[in-house]
Amino acid sequence: MALAVTHVLGAIFILDILRHYVFGKDKFPRYLLVIGGIAGLAPDIDFPLGWFISFVQGTSVNFHGEFTHSVLIAAIILFMGVVRHYQDDDKWAKIFYVIAAGWFIHIGFDCLFNSYETFLWPLEIQTKAFCPQKLAGFYRSGIDAI
């Protein structure tokens, strides 16, 4: 599994490349990079939620990689950006687009590091076959160290 810092910095790095070479600095302010970095970590909100539920119920609960790591949530956030775009609210459209990008980047990193098996929740389709096995095992600690 990729570490939290990899999710945050990786999302910021990828979004900054897009900012410089695709969209332009004037159309992509820096605060969006911060939002994208936070969104790159957002799918892991299931860790503290699981800890809280475990504390309240007195049992061990672990639902990491289930609903928060779904492409469906990222697609819903992307759709919210499209709706805001057509309502001529460009500021919020960009924010939703960047959150969706950070969410997709998180799922991509988790696929590369082979940390879970389903990213098409609520469908019960095992998606481990889509993720590269060799990269996940061989380069895992090296990429986190960089």
Protein language model features and the residues they cover:
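N-terminal membrane-targeting hydrophobic helices
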Residues: 1-146
